[in-house]
């Protein structure tokens, strides 16, 4: 499951038409049921929940891989379960069920996995695709009577068990400035009120500013480009310079770039800015707002 083009908009169509087209809710519910039954699995070392693929059909093997595109899913699950209301409001309604609780827990777990795709890299930016280590055969979430416990937080310890679950292939280490994870963080913050989602979103945005913000090219008297970093600089020096330059208001910037390798410091830029990068700016700028500043739900 790599494309949000259909699934994501089923529930949004239902909500944005004030529930007047229930067929879209039914289609969403059917899609989510299939995802929960066939595509959710646990990682081998820390029981992170992943939304995997079955490229050969339901009778084929599970392929433990997540594209960044899939990270729209946790926020959308929470949006659907609560109808766009806060979790406290939704749980107070007589229509709330134990299955809604399970959906919210699933949203939390998938959000954590998507956040792990950022934390696993040296730049703090997600690769386009992450593969995962799972048991053989994979343990499906649907096969367990109760959810398996996963780490409450993804530790910064380089030897933390959760890191062993990630396998980022060399051809998948590029970052195209996609907005799916930060969108889910925004929904999770607005719906649950959990501060960690604001913190994760802001940390993510700071990484984008640090590593993808492009300065105007500086040249010496002979017209040669002055490089921001020298080839023999150590990683800590590069990190310090990157952090300082985003605060330098005297510099002129010319946009943000996709990068070719999230595990290189500094990462090689591609000198192109994707159109959907602008959406990434929308959500971090709303994350600092308290719930009573902007009303997103009109009854």
Label the predicted regions.
Residues 1-299:
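Glycan-recognition and catalytic cores of secretory/periplasmic carbohydrate-active enzymes
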């Amino acid at each position: 499951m790599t494309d949000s083009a259909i699934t994501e908009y089923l529930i949004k169509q239902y909500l944005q038409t004030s529930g007047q087209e229930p067929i879209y809710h039914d289609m969403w519910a059917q899609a989510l049921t299939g995802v929960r039954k066939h595509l959710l699995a646990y990682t081998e070392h820390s029981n992170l929940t992943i939304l995997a693929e079955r490229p050969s059909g339901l009778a084929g093997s599970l392929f433990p891989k997540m594209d960044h595109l899939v990270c729209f899913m946790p926020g959308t699950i929470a949006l659907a379960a609560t109808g766009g209301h806060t979790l406290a409001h939704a749980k107070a309604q007589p229509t709330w069920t134990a299955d809604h609780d399970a959906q919210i827990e699933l949203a939390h777990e998938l959000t954590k996995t998507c956040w792990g795709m950022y934390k696993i890299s040296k730049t703090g930016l997600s690769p386009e695709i992450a593969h995962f280590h799972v048991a053989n055969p994979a343990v499906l979430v649907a096969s367990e009577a109760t959810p398996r416990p996963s780490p409450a937080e993804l530790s910064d310890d380089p030897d933390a068990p959760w890191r062993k679950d990630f396998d980022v292939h060399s051809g998948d280490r590029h970052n195209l400035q996609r907005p799916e994870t930060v969108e889910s963080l925004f929904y999770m913050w607005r719906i649950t009120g959990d501060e960690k989602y604001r913190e994760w979103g802001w940390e993510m945005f700071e990484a984008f500013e640090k590593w993808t913000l492009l300065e105007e090219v500086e040249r010496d008297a002979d017209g040669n480009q002055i490089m921001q970093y020298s080839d023999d600089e150590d990683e800590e020096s590069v990190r310090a310079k990157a952090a300082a330059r985003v605060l330098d208001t005297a510099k002129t910037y010319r946009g943000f770039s996709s990068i070719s390798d999230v595990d290189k410091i500094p990462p090689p830029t591609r000198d192109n800015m994707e159109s959907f990068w602008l959406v990434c700016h929308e959500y971090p700028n709303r994350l600092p707002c308290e719930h009573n500043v902007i009303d997103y739900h009109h009854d």
